């Protein structure tokens, strides 16, 4: 291996005959074993063992088969290298759960045992759950803390987060995903993997773990490329698990320069050849983007019911609800992950620019709302599946408005606390939008085809700082209302009808103008005319009719009649003139 220089520490190996198997804490006696353990980033570690066991321990296997709970298994080996105290090191190859056991008795009085086991990470991959993490400022550690509460006792934490895993790049919703699927997906947004490591689940690599320097003197070493990434593959007797940091100093075949790089084990396969345990592992460079972003396929096309927390607009200078009450991160062009640009796309862009490239318009002033998904999530799952929305109201979601740009839609916004339908058109939950209101108590009235009305709720003068609950403004030349029978206008306060030019109130039949108090007919600028085609009648049921003016003229072309129990003309006047061609006083 002239191209690889190593610190020449002793070569570590493990004898297959010194492998130890424990099932639920009891050590197993075995012979003639065949062992294979496969692990890789983003997958559970799977082990397959076949050996001959003693019939004296058949009760251990019977108990394991009959047990309803998980059966724990630990597979470990003893190294040839001793520690500072002279004691040989033990290394755990798999700490997990038995998935399947097969027993076969043979004529020699022994048992053939076949066991398939899987890492403890599998317990995260059993129950699909529904959770909202809609706060875009959440960190991976905060999310892991929430999920850890479902597992372990006495505060034990099965999930650990790498030190480079800070804020999740965008808001996320766990929809019909196991915790394993969800963590694997959100870790992919930073290019980092989810890994099963011993009895832990690791979110991203840990750079503060001590790096190992393999001795490759008796190992096969090779280089390969896959999906635009370069890997190194090593096969030898030294065993390294997935996520282990590795240091390698490699000499460039062309320049002869020695360069030391940091790598991670991203695949590992442990197996035995006779009495020798071997390990084939694959190394990826620490600077690589290890995994591509995983879309949320399970939420594509889904609808979650939600409660409106508040209505807003994204232009904070115009909105009564500022951005402090919600985040518009999911509206401003966030991608599904931070994946580097595909080199073929980059090449195409350099060679031929499309003249019709669509302009990417940044969100400016659009109608949005914040939501509480608790009720909808609870409807989707059973106990231990669904969780309340702890981060309600932390993200803006746009909602459908009729003709929103010209603003000609009619009452497009749901009200606070209305149930609405949040729709997810793609595998990116940040692209969700509200398609309308549903399942609100009282909206059954809309099923009546003879009743098409708009009803306001209770007065909001107190809660709404005295502003009108419904403000209707018409900017047009003509506004006409025509119905077949009745138009009824009623107000608990005042009704004002005003026109800058002329106001006509016309009826082809009888028209009544009445009031329980005073009725005033007044013109401040000109005459007030009362005209009837047949008669004009004025009647007061209790007191009198007063006509008060500097001059009063009464003119009749035919006959003028004044009739009463008593008529007084000119009481208190100095002179009373009664004129006519013929005057009769009787």
Each language-model region and where it sits:
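Structural signature for extended repeat/solenoid scaffolds and their inter-repeat hinge/linker regions
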Residues: 246, 305-563, 567-569
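Surface-exposed cap/loop segments at beta↔alpha junctions
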Residues: 58-159, 171-172
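Short, Lys/Arg- and Gly-enriched loop/turn segments at beta-strand edges
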Residues: 79-94, 253-266, 427-437
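Short, conserved beta-turn/loop elements at beta-strand boundaries and strand-helix junctions
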Residues: 100-107, 267-274, 311-317, 439-443
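Amphipathic, non-transmembrane alpha-helical segments in extracytoplasmic/periplasmic proteins
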Residues: 48-50, 117, 131-156, 175-196, ...
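Short beta-strand-centered interaction patches in the first periplasmic/extracellular domains
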Residues: 112-115, 119-121, 162-224, 260-262, ...
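Short coil-to-beta transition motif at edge beta-strands of beta-rich domains
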Residues: 63-83, 238-256, 416-420
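Juxtamembrane "anchor/assembly" segments of surface/extracellular structural proteins
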Residues: 1-72, 76, 116-122, 130, ...
């Amino acid at each position: 291996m002239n191209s690889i220089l190593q610190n020449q520490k002793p070569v570590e190996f493990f004898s297959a005959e010194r492998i130890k198997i424990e099932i639920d804490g009891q050590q197993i006696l075995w012979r003639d074993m065949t062992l294979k353990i496969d692990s890789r980033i983003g997958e559970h570690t799977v082990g397959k063992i076949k050996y001959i066991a003693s019939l004296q321990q058949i009760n251990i296997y019977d108990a394991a088969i009959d047990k309803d709970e998980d059966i724990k298994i630990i597979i470990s080996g003893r190294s040839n290298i001793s520690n500072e105290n002279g004691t040989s090191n033990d290394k755990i190859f798999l700490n997990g759960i038995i998935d399947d056991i097969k027993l076969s008795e043979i004529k020699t009085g022994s048992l053939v045992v076949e066991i398939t086991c899987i890492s403890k990470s599998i317990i995260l991959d059993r129950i699909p759950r529904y959770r909202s993490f809609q706060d875009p400022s959440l960190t991976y550690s905060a999310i892991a803390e929430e999920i850890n509460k479902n597992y372990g006792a006495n505060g034990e934490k099965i999930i650990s987060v790498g030190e480079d895993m800070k804020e999740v790049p965008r808001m996320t919703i766990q929809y019909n995903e196991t915790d394993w699927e969800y963590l694997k997906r959100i870790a992919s947004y930073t290019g980092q993997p989810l890994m099963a490591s011993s009895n832990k689940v690791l979110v991203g690599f840990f750079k503060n773990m001590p790096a190992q320097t393999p001795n490759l003197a008796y190992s096969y070493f090779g280089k390969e490329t896959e999906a635009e990434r370069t890997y190194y593959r090593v096969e030898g007797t030294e065993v390294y698990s997935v996520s282990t940091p590795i240091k390698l100093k490699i000499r460039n075949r062309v320049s002869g320069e020695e360069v030391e790089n940091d790598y991670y084990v991203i695949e590992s396969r442990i197996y035995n050849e006779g009495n020798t345990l071997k390990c084939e592992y694959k190394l990826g460079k620490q600077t690589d983007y290890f995994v591509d972003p995983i879309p949320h396929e399970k939420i594509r096309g889904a609808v979650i019911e939600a409660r409106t927390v508040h209505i807003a607009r994204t232009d904070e200078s115009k909105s009564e609800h500022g951005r402090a009450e919600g985040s518009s991160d999911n509206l401003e062009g966030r991608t599904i992950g931070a994946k580097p640009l595909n080199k073929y796309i980059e090449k195409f862009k350099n060679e031929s620019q499309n003249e019709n490239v669509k302009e990417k318009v940044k969100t400016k002033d659009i109608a949005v709302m914040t939501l509480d998904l608790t009720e909808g999530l609870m409807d989707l799952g059973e106990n231990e599946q669904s969780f309340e929305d702890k981060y309600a109201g932390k993200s803006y979601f746009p909602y459908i408005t009729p003709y929103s740009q010209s603003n000609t839609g009619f009452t497009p916004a749901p009200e606070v606390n209305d149930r609405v339908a949040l729709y997810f058109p793609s595998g990116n939950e940040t692209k969700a939008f509200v398609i309308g209101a549903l399942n609100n108590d009282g909206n059954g009235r809309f099923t009546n085809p003879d009743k098409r009305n708009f009803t306001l709720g209770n007065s909001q003068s107190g809660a709404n700082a005295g502003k009108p609950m419904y403000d209707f403004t018409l900017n047009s030349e003509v506004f006409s209302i025509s119905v077949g029978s009745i138009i009824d206008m009623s107000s608990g306060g005042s009704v004002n009808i005003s026109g800058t030019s002329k106001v006509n109130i016309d009826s082809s039949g009888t028209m009544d103008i009445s009031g329980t108090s005073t009725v005033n007919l007044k013109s401040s600028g000109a005459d007030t005319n009362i005209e009837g085609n047949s008669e004009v009648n004025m009647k007061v049921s209790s007191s009198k009719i007063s006509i008060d003016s500097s001059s009063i003229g009464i003119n009749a072309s035919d006959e003028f009649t004044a009739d009463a129990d008593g008529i007084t003309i000119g009481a208190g006047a100095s002179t009373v003139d009664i004129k006519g061609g013929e005057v009769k006083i009787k």
